[in-house]
Amino acid sequence: MFGRTYYCGEITEKAIGETVVLKGWVQKRRDLGGLIFIDLRDRTGIVQVVFNPDVSKDALETAESIRSEYVLDITGKVVAREEATVNPNLKTGRIEIQAESVDVLSAAKTPPFAISDQAAEVSEDIRLKHRYLDLRRPEMFNSLKMRHNVTKAVRRFLDDNGFLDIETPVLTKSTPEGARDYLVPSRVHEGEFYALPQSPQIFKQLLMVSGFDRYYQIARCFRDEDLRADRQPEFTQIDIEMSFMSQEDIMKLSEEMMAHVMRETHGIEISLPLPRMSYEDAMNRYGSDKPDTRFGMLLTDVSEAVKDSDFKVFASAVANGGAVKAINVKGAAANYSRKDIDALGEFAANYGAKGLAWLKTEADGLKGPIAKFFAGEKQEALVQALDAADGDLLLFVADKLEVANDALGALRLKLGKELNLIDESLFNFLWVVDWPLLEYDAEEGRYYAAHHPFTMPVREDLKLIETNPQDMKAQAYDLVLNGYELGGGSIRIFEKDVQEKMFGLLGFSEEEAKEQFGFLLEAFDYGAPPHGGIALGLDRLVMLLSGRTNLRDTIAFPKTASASCLMTEAPSEVDNAQLDELHLEIKRKIRQ
């Protein structure tokens, strides 16, 4: 019953004349009066099966009751199609199967949506509710196959380079690493909780202290944070750590791994070494710490050209220590009306901009509401600074440098998509380096780690740790692909006194540091090697390599934007007996 000689999509003309056994699902059924045609589908593709009374009346009789998504066991002979019926859109389009027998292995109800990539758009909620049906679609299968191929390529590369695949705990200690932890109550230890790991960070460092030298793991991680299209509450990262390696060594090995992945999955050779860009340069030129370099429209600082202008918004921004930044949207002046530009201003306001000034370049000079403030040499300076030509649209934000960069960076991406400036066939990798070690929150009056508390400062900057910590640079590096952060890494602190000082900078008391990380600090007392590593988001990498725009399309059973599973209806309530065992009581909010 379960012997199979071919997958449906792999039968070629070489098999003509053979009797084959196939298994699969009914994609489509057509009754032409006397003959019935079925497209039989499995994970490899589709093959046409013909039920002909001259071949088997019993098979034809069974086929009359068959409907879409029935699971069939078919035996038949491979024959060549007549030339007029060849289907060039199918790999198997030059052959068909003359059915000699058919068994219905499983009947099926009419599915809530067509199992086809060409079907009318179906709401994502319906797809997620019936995920087992959605996964039958070829594009979904291909996304998960890409995930398998990427993982396989990563494992092969790391295995060949002397890394050991080591699992780290999933039930661990709650430590502050940025997002909220998912907590797991302990039945045995009343009132105490495990946390699901946000990353294996501390454990992989301890493995280096243990002398394992090269570690990797395809690691499941969990973060209870607000979701968006490229985030999931549970996600997978390619986690790597190495001893006695410099930042250069780790970056070199990481990009060689990515080159191997691209070669194995896409047959593409990427040029090494990958481009590098400083954090400061990325923010100032692209308005983003994960720049999309597939198109231009770079940010330009025009503060010098406008600081003495009569337009007070510009002049005062510069005088108050801010900046005037601009982008030149080449040839777009005619495409954007005043109403359109107002909408762009509203968009920029979402990123903190108080306004969006604009000018259009025409043959006889600059036009627009602020053009009167820029005549003669001032106009020439602005045109020259922005390389403006007839037909260009110039957009300006005058504000604190960070606000101007953020707003114009977001606007640049929006316009790049609207104007089809992005070559979707490109895979533009780059490194962002020279990160600040710390970020200062003026409202709270404290520092936060720009990456995490275990990142080593640049050695030359260690002398600033007690006097000017805000000036310290990190030995950190982020890998970016097409405007998405694939992941980041750093050289780690491996000296106890430096780690203690870092905890102090971040607001930990000595007691808090010992409570949270005492085991790590103690490990450093027993001879810790210099070490570092990187973690790359597998879900996001697969999303980009498979041409998807949503992480959920690269995960077999993902969560929604509200961190729920529509198929299993998780999370769900549990009964009181389970709560009692865990020494828990639900305190419900009173709704007003």
From Swiss-Prot:
The gene is aspS. Homodimer. Catalyzes the attachment of L-aspartate to tRNA(Asp) in a two-step reaction: L-aspartate is first activated by ATP to form Asp-AMP and then transferred to the acceptor end of tRNA(Asp). The keyword Calcium does not apply. This is Aspartate--tRNA ligase. It catalyses: tRNA(Asp) + L-aspartate + ATP = L-aspartyl-tRNA(Asp) + AMP + diphosphate. HAMAP family: Asp_tRNA_synth_type1. Keywords: Aminoacyl-tRNA synthetase, ATP-binding, Cytoplasm, Ligase, Nucleotide-binding, Protein biosynthesis. Its EC number is 6.1.1.12. One of its GO terms (molecular function) is transferase activity. L-aspartate binds at E177, R223, H451, R492. ATP binds at R223, D224, E225, Q232, E485, G537, L538, D539, R540. Belongs to the class-II aminoacyl-tRNA synthetase family. Type 1 subfamily. Disulfide bonds: none annotated. GO terms for cellular component: cytoplasm. Coiled coil: none annotated. Residues 201-204 are annotated as: Aspartate. It comes from the Bacteria. One of its GO terms (biological process) is aspartyl-tRNA aminoacylation. PANTHER family: ASPARTATE--TRNA LIGASE, MITOCHONDRIAL, ASPARTYL/LYSYL-TRNA SYNTHETASE. It is an enzyme of class 6 (ligase). It is found in: Cytoplasm.
